Amino acid sequence: MGDSHVDTSSTVSEAVAEEVSLFSMTDMILFSLIVGLLTYWFLFRKKKEEVPEFTKIQTLTSSVRESSFVEKMKKTGRNIIVFYGSQTGTAEEFANRLSKDAHRYGMRGMSADPEEYDLADLSSLPEIDNALVVFCMATYGEGDPTDNAQDFYDWLQETDVDLSGVKFAVFGLGNKTYEHFNAMGKYVDKRLEQLGAQRIFELGLGDDDGNLEEDFITWREQFWPAVCEHFGVEATGEESSIRQYELVVHTDIDAAKVYMGEMGRLKSYENQKPPFDAKNPFLAAVTTNRKLNQGTERHLMHLELDISDSKIRYESGDHVAVYPANDSALVNQLGKILGADLDVVMSLNNLDEESNKKHPFPCPTSYRTALTYYLDITNPPRTNVLYELAQYASEPSEQELLRKMASSSGEGKELYLSWVVEARRHILAILQDCPSLRPPIDHLCELLPRLQARYYSIASSSKVHPNSVHICAVVVEYETKAGRINKGVATNWLRAKEPAGENGGRALVPMFVRKSQFRLPFKATTPVIMVGPGTGVAPFIGFIQERAWLRQQGKEVGETLLYYGCRRSDEDYLYREELAQFHRDGALTQLNVAFSREQSHKVYVQHLLKQDREHLWKLIEGGAHIYVCGDARNMARDVQNTFYDIVAELGAMEHAQAVDYIKKLMTKGRYSLDVWS
C-alpha cells in the first residue's frame, strides 16, 4: 500500500482564526486516517500475511534444494553428472548412456536436464571428490541452443564465475550440412575453459549427416580410459545389463488416473488450459486436408489447423510442432510377436528414487498407449538397445549378431551400419529377422526412445489467418534395402486426418508453435529474395500473404521475388494457382519456377538465380534480405555457392571476399536459412 501525503501549505489563509481552525480540522483528519491505517495494518494485514510468509519460505527453501545439483550429488553419492541439451531426445539418450557407464568404473553417475537446475552451482562441484561434469549438447536450427539449454547458454554468456577446479568434457551433436555445425557444443567447450574449468578429454563432434551413433561410440570408447587415467581408477568389469525401471502392473485402477496419450498433465486433452507448449500441446481440429499435386507417385498435402480460442499467436516463418501417433498396425504386430496383452495398464517406476525422472513416459498407462503415442518404434534402434536385447535371444547366432553390432570393433560398426542403419530396420523388423529374440515387453518399452514432435514451417500468415495454422508436407513412404515398405510416422498420420463431416467427429492434432528467427524484414519496403523448392515454399506462402496484406493496408512494399523449383509443372507444382494470383495482383514481383524434369537437362533454382544475377546483385546492394528454405544437404549449399559466385562476379571480389560478404549478411540477419536434412 502506498503512503498518503498531504501538502498542508495549500491551506494557508490570511485570517488567523480561519487558519487555526482549518489546521485543527486537518490535523484531526490526518490523525484519524493514520490511526485507522495502523489499526488495519497490525490487526488485519499482518494476520493475513503470517501464514503466506511462512509458506513462501518453505517453497523457496525447497526450490533452492532442488536446483542445487551439487547438493543432490552429495546426498546420493554421485560424482559424475551428465547434462544434456536435447531437442529430439538423442542428446538425452547419450547422456543416460554415459551416466549408466559410470558404474563400470566404480563411479556413480546421473543425467540431468539443465533447465531443472541452477548451473551457477558448477563452481561448487570441486567439493565432491573425483567429480566430473559432462555436457551432451545438441545444436538446433542455425547454431542455436536447444529449448532446454537456452537458460544455460544465456548464463554462460553473462557469467564471469570462477570454475577453477571443475573437470569437464563435452560431446556435441550436430549436422555438417548446416552452416553452424555443432555451434553449441563448441561454444560450451570453449566457454568453460575460458571460465577456468579443466577439460579432461577432447571435444566430441557428432555428425547426424554421417553416422551419429558411430561418432558417439568412437568418442565414448576413448573418453572413459581418459577419465580412468585422470582419476586413477580402473574398470570394475564388462558392460552389464542394468534395469533402470521397475514394472508395476495395475490390475484395479481408476480409469481417470490412466494416461491415454497426454504429453504432460493427466486429462489435459479433456480440459485444455493455455499457455500451450511442448509439455502442454493444444488439440487443434483439422479443417482442411487437400492434396496439392496431381501425380500419383507422391502425395503432397496442405492442412489447416484451427487454433481459435487457444490464445496461440504465431508469426510468418515460425514452426508448428505436431505430436504424431504410430501406425496401429505396427503396434498390433509388436504386441503379437511378443505375445503381450497390449491393454494391460502398467507403470515403469525409476529404481533410483532420487531421480527427477520418475518414469520413461507418462504413467500409469497401457502398453498400447505407450507404443502408440510415447515410444519411437520406426527408427533404427541404437547399439545400446541391441546390446540390452541380446540377452533375450535364445539362438546363439542371433545373440552373437546383436552383440557384435553393439560392440566398438570395426567389424561390428560396419555390420550395424549396413544391417540396421542403411537397411532402415526398426524394432519390429529386427524381431521378425531374429525369430528367437523375444524380450519382455516392459524392458523393450524401457529401452525404446521417446516419440518426438515433428516440426513444419508454417505456410500461412497470422495477419491473414489469425485463427489457423497451415502445414505443407510430403507423405513419406519408401522401400528399404531389405525389401520392406517403411512409412513416415507423422506425414502418414496427418494424411489420414480428414476434416469432420456432418456426422463424423473432429480430427484432432496435438500441436504447439515454436518461435523462429526466420522473419520478414521490419521495414516492408525492404526487398526480399526467397528461394524454396518443393515443400520449402511453405514459409514463403506466409511471407507473400503478409506482403499482400500490407499492400491492401496501403503500405509501400518492396520487391518480392520467389525462386521455386519442382519436377514438372503438371505433377508437383505446389500452390500453383495461389502463386499465379499473387503474381497477377503484384504482391509477388517475380515468380521464377525451375522444372527439373521437363527438359533433357536438369534446371534447378540456382540456375535461375545465375540468370538473374545482375538484378539480384542490385537488390542485395540495396539492402535486400535473402531467405532459403528446404534441403540442407544439396540445395541450400548449391544456392549459397551461387550467391558466392554472384557476389564475386558483380562485386569484383575474390572468392574468399565473397564468402565473407555472405557470412556478414548472415550475421546481420539478411541471409536466413530454414533448412533440414
Swiss-Prot record:
- What's an example GO cellular component term for this entry? endoplasmic reticulum membrane
Q: Where does FAD bind?
A: R424, R454, Y455, Y456, S457, C472, A473, V474, Y478, G488, V489, A490, T491, W676
The reaction(s) annotated as catalysed by this protein in its Swiss-Prot or TrEMBL entry are: 2 oxidized [cytochrome P450] + NADPH = 2 reduced [cytochrome P450] + NADP(+) + H(+)
Residue ranges, Lumenal side: 2-21
- Give the N-acetylglycine positions (modified residues): G2
Where, by residue number, does the polypeptide cross the bilayer?
22-42
User: Residues where Phosphoserine occurs?
Assistant: S63
Topology in the membrane?
A: Single-pass membrane protein
Instruction: Give GO terms: molecular function aspect only.
Output: cytochrome-b5 reductase activity, acting on NAD(P)H; electron transfer activity; enzyme activator activity; enzyme binding; flavin adenine dinucleotide binding; FMN binding; hydrolase activity; iron-cytochrome-c reductase activity
Swiss-Prot/TrEMBL cofactor(s): FAD; FMN
- Alphabetically list the UniProt keywords: Acetylation, Congenital adrenal hyperplasia, Craniosynostosis, Disease variant, Endoplasmic reticulum, FAD, Flavoprotein, FMN, Membrane, NADP, Oxidoreductase, Phosphoprotein, Transmembrane, Transmembrane helix
| Cellular localisation | Endoplasmic reticulum membrane
EC numbers, comma separated: 1.6.2.4
Q: Which GO terms describe its biological process?
A: carnitine metabolic process; cellular response to follicle-stimulating hormone stimulus; cellular response to peptide hormone stimulus; demethylation; electron transport chain; fatty acid oxidation; flavonoid metabolic process; negative regulation of apoptotic process
PANTHER family from the UniProt entry = NADPH--CYTOCHROME P450 REDUCTASE (PTHR19384:SF17), NITRIC OXIDE SYNTHASE-RELATED (PTHR19384)
The family line of this record is:
Belongs to the NADPH--cytochrome P450 reductase family.
Job description of the protein: This enzyme is required for electron transfer from NADP to cytochrome P450 in microsomes. It can also provide electron transfer to heme oxygenase and cytochrome B5.
Q: What is this protein called?
A: NADPH--cytochrome P450 reductase
